Amino acid sequence: MQPTNPNQFTEKAWEAIAHTPEIAKQHQQQQIESEHLMKALLEQDGLASGILTKAGVNLQKISDRTEQYIQRQPKVSGNSTSVYLGRSLDTLLDRAEAHRKDFQDEYISIEHLLLAYPKDDRFGKGLFQEFALDESKLKNIIKQVRGSQTVTDQNPEGKYQSLEKYGRDLTEAARKGQLDPVIGRDDEIRRTIQILSRRTKNNPVLIGEPGVGKTAIAEGLAQRIVAGDVPQSLKDRKLISLDMGAMIAGAKFRGEFEERLKAVLKEVTESGGNIVLFIDEIHTVVGAGATQGAMDAGNLLKPMLARGELRCIGATTLDEYRKYIEKDAALERRFQQVYVDQPSVEDTISILRGLKERYEVHHGVKISDSSLVAAATLSSRYISDRFLPDKAIDLVDEAAARLKMEITSKPEELDEIDRKILQLEMEKLSLQKESDAASRERLERLEKELADLKEEQRTLNTQWQSEKDVINKLQSVKEEIDKVNLEIQQAERNYDLNRAAELKYGNLTDLHRRLEATERELSQTQGTGKSLLREEVTEADIAEIISKWTGIPISKLVESEKEKLLHLEDELHHRVIGQDEAVTAVADAIQRSRAGLADPNRPTASFVFLGPTGVGKTELAKALASYMFDTEDALVRIDMSEYMEKHAVSRLIGAPPGYVGYEEGGQLTETIRRRPYAVILFDEIEKAHPDVFNIFLQILDDGRVTDAQGHTVDFKNTIIIMTSNIGSQYILDIAGDNSRYDEMRHRVMEAMRNSFRPEFLNRIDEVIIFHSLDKKELRQIVQLQVERLKARLDDRKISLRLSDVALDFLAEVGYDPVFGARPLKRAIQRELETQIAKAILRGEFNDGDTIFVDVQNERLSFSRLPVEVFSS
């Protein structure tokens, strides 16, 4: 048979035949024989390889034998490029045609070509005998692969074993112990089994938020099927997870995707209810593969789902269910909903305890029970935009991975010594070139130091290696225990009770003894001195990971805050001068809240700061952020003068749907979602439009607000401060006259009531009035500002000293009761900082000098102090 007509062959078969002349030319041969076709088939990595692998043939070996046979054939030298068909290939194609007729196929396919080889006297017969393959064995394997399919088009290979190609057998994975244990979720699994046992519409769809464990329920069902813990209707069934991505990938031509899907569905229905299909992210089925006028995958599924021919479990999130499946009422009615809710913190702890062993074996570390409790409680409290148990499992996983990374990388102490040795070695090399006495003396000292360091390095290296070896030994023992437990389960499933008992009371007991001995060895190794490696995940590790995720300082999560809260007032007094009443009121409110006496559903504290400009309102907010949350970055400052129009409220919580900027979220809500622990400063609130205050009502009362995209943003851990200049003229009127304080407070509060609505004022914890500053307080502020300048000069190793007269001079120059401390800042910049900068640039002061500042002729004078004066 001359292979001249590609229409007689399937695409893959013709591809292999068309490749044979190329192979012959590569080997300088003019005659194309059956061995060239075999090489082409093996290089294809398609159906031929699959059939031979199923027959137990080593593909590498058969490929090598074919190559060796080709190499032994005569070669033709010269420039001739013509090749012609050999007799063996001609007769092989005739036999393939005969097999096609036997199978009642329309085209010659790969399997027909393979079946023709056992009778190929030239090459195939000997090759197949060597690998113990005959025609009947090949036919049986081909029937297994093809099932009931016949070759009716030129691409039949895509439909063979389509479930194997586009699906993952979850029951097989459960049998091999590849799935994580599923703890709890009994109600959801029972309801799923109940729906699967119906006669028609036996298709449950698991819907719930991302990360609550929908896929885990399907895996739990697979584990129950394997354990036989299911009703008769599901006994010995296969649960296969369909990979929609693999089905769509590479479907180049119109209808190819539908063809693949039909092949999968045909295989499922022909199994006679033996296969249950699981489609994760089932919303991808709606609209998949639909081009102009073509049917989508959802419509192909509908008839089978309604008749009960196909048992299918779907899983999707609430948003996607609403967006895709609810729109298609015909598809929705074929699925029965199983709602999967987020587990409670207690249930999450149980889930983590069940998974603990898996993670310990994978990472080779120990995970303490307290760290599991911390992961569940802290993630529930601080990570509000994700769901349990997923976020808690992620925390434990990342903390264990971080610890594993520490174990495998060099300890910090050892790394420091290595770097020090390297530095000294380089110094030694340069000193060896010098011949003076000082250099030789330094060289001797250096060599002694090097010898000591190398000795310490050797000791630490030995300790690190021994600790690492024991930890690795621990991991391998745990892995063996895991394997033996899996073997015990398999033996019990097969009712091989002798084997199960032998493993349980023999191998497993020995392994547990080895585990205890290794743990003792580790504690002895680490007990000899300071341990270099930790092998247990603790609460602190979990807290550190949460801190990295959310930006919440670790001290908030782990350390006791009592000390911090007790010293809060003192700390604020250091930074905010002259506002004792304000500082005390703020500290009291926060201490009340943190001690658990305040309402937990409201912000930690909310204040309105009233007072003239420059008296420390913003400074107190900064000091509070810095002390409570360890960084001034925790201060979220929103200037209310930018919210003077009614529509500006959309900038705080995000633009409504349909408006430009809807996707971006709001300035306030997005910031607090990313950093839930913050001090929020609304500056100059009297300048905002009255409608903007409506948003404050729910923040101050319920501690939460819903943004334009429907996310609930939690304000319960924030401290809210609003500043205003309302009534500042009354405060300035009584500057220094404490006898009129009550009268002034009454007038300021009256001004507040005239400007703001009662429902807003009623929700604020405290209205705090700031006094104007007098000269004595300004002098203290001068000292504070000078301390900051000293810190900046420290970088240049320059010291700064000011006489009392100089401090008084700066306080006098910067005193302005109307503008508070701001003119003082400008005076210090003008009189002190600028003059020092100019003197340094002129070269009057150098690094390491001490500058003494005094007053001469009603101006500041600058002089260099001798070192001995300073040291005395």
From Swiss-Prot:
Entry binding sites for ATP 2: G611, P612, T613, G614, V615, G616, K617, T618
Region called NBD1, residue ranges: 161-342
Residue ranges constituting the Clp R domain according to the UniProt record: 6-148
Keyword vocabulary terms for this entry: ATP-binding, Chaperone, Coiled coil, Cytoplasm, Nucleotide-binding, Repeat, Stress response
Entry's Gene Ontology molecular function annotations: ATP binding; ATP hydrolysis activity
CC annotations in GO: cytoplasm
Region (C-terminal): 773-872
Positions of region (Repeat 2): 85-148
Binding site for ATP 1: G208, E209, P210, G211, V212, G213, K214, T215
One Pfam family it belongs to: AAA
Record region (Linker): 343-551
Compartments reported by the entry: Cytoplasm
Stretches the record annotates as Repeat 1: 9-73
Ranges in a coiled coil: 393-527
Stretches the record annotates as NBD2: 561-772
GO annotation, biological process: cellular response to heat; protein refolding
SMART domains: AAA, ClpB_D2-small
Function: Part of a stress-induced multi-chaperone system, it is involved in the recovery of the cell from heat-induced damage, in cooperation with DnaK, DnaJ and GrpE. Acts before DnaK, in the processing of protein aggregates. Protein binding stimulates the ATPase activity; ATP hydrolysis unfolds the denatured protein aggregates, which probably helps expose new hydrophobic binding sites on the surface of ClpB-bound aggregates, contributing to the solubilization and refolding of denatured protein aggregates by DnaK.
Subunit structure: Homohexamer. The oligomerization is ATP-dependent.
Family: Belongs to the ClpA/ClpB family.
UniProt remark on domains: The Clp repeat (R) domain probably functions as a substrate-discriminating domain, recruiting aggregated proteins to the ClpB hexamer and/or stabilizing bound proteins. The NBD2 domain is responsible for oligomerization, whereas the NBD1 domain stabilizes the hexamer probably in an ATP-dependent manner. The movement of the coiled-coil domain is essential for ClpB ability to rescue proteins from an aggregated state, probably by pulling apart large aggregated proteins, which are bound between the coiled-coils motifs of adjacent ClpB subunits in the functional hexamer.
Protein name in UniProt: Chaperone protein ClpB 2
Organism of provenance: Nostoc sp. (strain PCC 7120 / SAG 25.82 / UTEX 2576)
